[in-house]
């Protein structure tokens, strides 16, 4: 079906140059000058994991075709800096004050990040203080700075058992000068910003203002995007948990749909611009018949045709729809939220109403047709992380603390090809990762969902083959019985 196979690149433009314009110089991580202090973990310093050498991995390990040499040549010339604990560090631990702020929507793993940052700062480095700023960047503003709270080992010990963030969160920018004033007044040397694109762009402004003032401040981002749409990263914290919980919602929709005569289950999942959660939930559950994602815009007529095609072979249909799909169906809501994100039409509600109207229109063909709608978004965002996500949060946070203590600044930490890398904030927020409709994940989705070309014919051909095989078995049995007479 041509309507479902729109071409797309792996990233989309977002506020800056596209990925193919990124240079090696753009990927160079900024570091505060001077490393005159020894890492306090002296008994581990001589081990391999502590190194002052900056190592790299290839941005893309695939070799160029047609290039013949002793060593393969990557299709991308870019290299990414590996994150690691450093033997010599920039900040003197007993004099260092660490700040942590969480911004934007909540996500599984936020408390794990806060906990791991605090425990690494206190246990491994024995820093002077760890300060948590309340309710996002508002907590750094003149009006909100009085709400700052000190974090201790005892105050974060059990917070990883719960969803949300103990520091609170908020959306929207604050005055950069005011925020840097607060950091200077409290003597903060390292600020960890945990949040999405908007948060990290705010962190970039803080880093630039601190640099302009000559402040000895490292600003380090830990990206929070449940949609898994961060460029240069193959996984963000909370995504695995989101897929796991999304599958539970799909199974519930399936149970509802198969219990009805022409039942349709609709599940709306997160994914403003990228449909990774929807696609992975479809593949993992193996119970979705239609998967609608922003990268593959199709019309209402096509969606109804897909449902009709499904009903030709079954009396139930399960649809997964990402929240960013179909924003042109009603002309969009217009405007932006406090974080600068475009306000979205509630496509789950819109789609449900359109399907209900279509079923009423075709009630003679599909008697008792019913739609059940499930939106698990806030339940998913609010739950604690899976064990694997918790481990991932701990690793991200620990390495972030090590690199920040060594003076890395104006950058984020990310996972790429199973390696932890540092990426300058400006580059990391310049492009957004999206589903590749020619890639493996979307191919898997298409293999298990309804299409408009050959699905019914293949189903009917399979039925005919089964009938012919049954007839053949009966024939052979009769021949065998006759031969004994």
Swiss-Prot record:
Cellular compartments per GO CC: glycosome
Cofactor(s) needed: Mg(2+)
Keywords for this protein: Allosteric enzyme, ATP-binding, Glycolysis, Glycosome, Kinase, Magnesium, Metal-binding, Nucleotide-binding, Peroxisome, Transferase
Residues that coordinate or bind Mg(2+): 197
Record entry for activity regulation: Allosterically activated by AMP.
Molecular function as annotated in GO: 6-phosphofructokinase activity; ATP binding; metal ion binding
Localization in the cell: Glycosome
Signal peptide boundaries: none
Subunit structure: Homotetramer.
Protein name: ATP-dependent 6-phosphofructokinase
Predominant location: other
Enzyme Commission designation: 2.7.1.11
Protein task: Catalyzes the phosphorylation of D-fructose 6-phosphate to fructose 1,6-bisphosphate by ATP, the first committing step of glycolysis.
Catalytic residues as annotated in Swiss-Prot or TrEMBL: 227
Uppermost EC category: transferase
Family annotation (Gene3D superfamilies): 3.40.50.450
